Amino acid sequence: MEGSEADLLHITDQEQAHLVPEDCEVPVVVTVHDLFHLRPREIKAGDIRVPVGNQRPGLFRRRDLKRLKAGLERADLLICISEMTKRDVERMFPGKPTALVRHQIDLDYWDPEGNPRSRDLLTEHDDDSKCLLITVGSDEPRKRLDFVRDVIASLPEEVAQDIHMLHIGSEVELSDEQLVTALQHAEALLFPSISEGFGYPPAEAMAAGCPVIAANLPAHNEVIPERCLLPATDVMAWVDEVVKVHAAWKRAGGVPRNPDDSLIDYVRDSLSPEAQGEALSRAYETACR
């Protein structure tokens, strides 16, 4: 930074926090997405406990984590992408200034009317005679895909036979364009994750006008309307909601659903680039005082 005309240094990922200079001449801000690796934990989900973060990092990773924590301690302000992350940060770094700046969603990219994608792009993974439900994400334990499988297995037979379940990212790899297609055409996204730093898939689904059924858990429950949230471990509550989705699909004659404009508007109001820009500007002003 020596000789630079910069007013502020922003490191946008805590995994690079070791780069925070010592005795920096300008304020240093670091964005913290989550503390899953700095503060690994187990979260109870019904009668099981789900690990979040690496419970037993190796020698080199432990050394890295120590350097990252020291870098975060040197920063002047920690930007957090969710209220949950903000609470975690304030517990780990008491007295450290924090600011909430959520991620942004590119509404134009997901827009089902302004940027529509043909369902034909999913042909090799799809059955357009059935009610398409999707999950998006890895198969790590905290994503709880086994819970979704339990839900599907518990559906009435006449409903289950009409369901085409597509697990994107964990079982099927899609291109970026195919992912847009899936979110624009699925009858619903199922998102049972037990813990997220933010929760991109449901936010992107809503931007595409796709109904969301999600576990009422942090931090994704901060950015999802209450009507889309269900108890995380209540299989029958999820079954009932899927049955409703199927019934609506059946009543429509199996034709593609209309985009849910209320969900698109929800994302526009809270997660647009403009909303993020305003929050980021306020955070920078705080750091530069």
Question: Each PLM stretch: what is its role?
Answer:
Residues 1-289:
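Carbohydrate transferase catalytic cores enriched for Leloir-type hexosyltransferases
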